[in-house]
């Protein structure tokens, strides 16, 4: 009986002992998971998968073998917790028994993949704009190419051009893209075209560009500056007579955000400006005082940051949001920058849909064809002239400039100068023509600009003047009038009065000098007269 009892106890231990070890193994893993989770640094979570941790009873295994398996599992989990893993948010302990053998996830399943991104751009990473010649809106192959270069896609373009912008640290991006038959260029930074200067009203200057005598050289003399003749004439005596206001024309401005104003809005929904450039451009375009197109609608593509800079990729993305206006429309760029085939292609596409595109030539005193978007064949590229209709020292020049307009001495209450202001003035004058001819083609617009511009004294470039448009069958110009008299009569009167005053002062001075000299001579005669001999 003793031996029978020992056999029964051994059998029970064989059955219940294995189960106990199995249960303890799972419980031990749970405890280890909780303890390890407390010791883990923030951001690392150890999670138990119930379905994977339920082990089937290994009926053919001995207790020693089961104990060995338990130690192996614990060792494996501890190693994975203690090993540093950057960028990993979860570590899953995977243990599974298949029949008599244990199949556990190897270390490769717990290693972070190469595609995991931390969200930061490394110092060696560069950003690019990738496009293809055929505009079909399909970017799938381009995205696959970017992924093969270990890059991350930032933007996709499907409306004006087909392309993507991406960043990659791959050292051979240009060659890989060329082999794929696509066009790639590095992302660039574009800046607003502005400088600083003290300036009066630009319309007043435009009015005197062609005058022979009463030109801006005449009004710029020191006497007129001291007496503030120009300010008196523009503020108190002058009135701008116009017959068209650009009504029904939609103007889109790519620039910094603008402050709240009637007839204008930021497409991003922002209500305040953080840079004065956008406000000045808006004032020149649709301002009730300083703009030609006083009744045009202005929408601002406010993709330019507060520093006056915008990346090429963000600018192209902003142009994707350019909506159909249902009427004549003008796109005005407030920025210029390095030559970009991608930007030029996008601008050409926009122009082909009937939108008039006006851009600044740039402020680098360089060849204009080296800059975009002004080098695009479909853009009206505008340079800057000074108050004497001479090309500004900062303005770009060359064959890619269509015409010039005032870029210095533009507004009385602003210190900004630059070719972007010139572009705004030209765009505002085009809006007047589109009001009367909403379906005008580019040759007609160019003819209108030719009629309302003049060639400089050397005949080498065209300068915009105050527009002349038809009104009830007549061609009348928008001019300044001073109390019903022609404008030049008033300065002529000023000249006569000032000349008379100067002559009067000169005569008074000569007269006083002569009297003083005579008095001095008389005093000398009295002082040195010899005494009279009375005897």
From Swiss-Prot:
Active site (UniProt): 255 (charge relay system), 277 (charge relay system), 420 (charge relay system)
Stretches that traverse the bilayer: 489-509
EC number assigned by the record: 3.4.21.-
InterPro entries in the record: PCSK9_ProteinaseK-like (IPR034193), Peptidase_S8/S53_dom (IPR000209), Peptidase_S8/S53_dom_sf (IPR036852), Peptidase_S8_subtilisin-like (IPR050131)
GO biological process, one term: proteolysis
CDD domains recorded: Peptidases_S8_PCSK9_ProteinaseK_like
Peptidase S8 domain boundaries: 221-475
Summary of the function given for this chain in its UniProt record: May be involved in the degradation of proteins for nutrient acquisition or possess a regulatory function by proteolytic activation of proproteins.
Protein name, as recorded: Putative subtilisin-like proteinase 2
Organism, as annotated: Encephalitozoon cuniculi (strain GB-M1)
